């Protein structure tokens, strides 16, 4: 989180747009009771981690409700980034998995799309950078993978993640 500056500048405008895109707040310039209730539901358990994430080991924790991926080490969040998931036709499966394969330049054989910095955790499902998520934001979806839109974060996560690292996917 950043400090409040009292200035509504280009950085603030970009942050508000990003928030609106992530949560679908359009045409709602006034915080009504309904908007406030939605905000409360979305942020009520912000940062709450399930027991499977609170181990002495390094864990990739993916909260599908908050739409974030957190890297947790020694029971503390050391990295947080936006994430997006599959659709009802191609869902991202909830559960506890382990990274079993890493591929820096993977291309999907099923969809012929790039999946750079892939960390596979369940069959063909992986945590990976998505140039489409970067370009389209939350308007698109994956085919069951966990997409990361920040390339630098994906590279860092790939570098510090080992085979066998737990991946916990849940809804808070």
Model-flagged regions — what are they?
Residues 80-82, 96-98, 166:
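Well-ordered beta-strand positions in beta-sheet-rich domains
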Residues 13, 17, 36, 66, ...:
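Extracytoplasmic/secreted envelope proteins and their assembly/folding machinery
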Residues 69, 99, 119:
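Conserved hydrophobic/aromatic pocket- or pore-lining residues that grip, position, or stack substrates
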Residues 1-39:
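Short acidic, glycine/serine/threonine-rich helix-capping segments at coil-helix boundaries
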Residues 48-87:
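A structural motif detector for short, solvent-exposed N-terminal "entry" segments of globular domains
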Residues 26-27, 45-55, 90-94, 103-172:
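Exported/periplasmic cell-wall-interacting domains
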């Amino acid at each position: 989180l950043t400090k409040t500056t009292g200035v509504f500048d280009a950085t603030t405008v970009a942050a508000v747009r990003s928030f609106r895109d992530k949560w679908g707040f359009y045409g709602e310039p006034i915080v009504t009771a309904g908007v406030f209730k939605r905000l409360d539901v979305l942020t009520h358990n912000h940062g709450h981690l399930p027991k499977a994430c609170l181990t002495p080991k390094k864990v990739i924790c993916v909260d599908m409700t908050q739409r974030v991926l957190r890297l947790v080490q020694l029971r503390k969040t050391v990295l947080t980034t936006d994430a997006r998931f599959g659709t009802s036709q191609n869902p991202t499966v909830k559960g506890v998995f382990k990274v079993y394969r890493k591929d820096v330049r993977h291309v999907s054989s099923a969809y012929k799309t790039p999946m750079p910095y892939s960390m596979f955790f369940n069959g063909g499902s992986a945590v990976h950078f998505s140039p489409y998520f970067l370009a389209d934001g939350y308007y698109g979806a994956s085919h069951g993978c966990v997409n990361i839109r920040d390339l630098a974060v994906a590279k860092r996560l790939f570098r510090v993640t080992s085979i066998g690292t737990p991946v916990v996917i849940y809804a808070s």
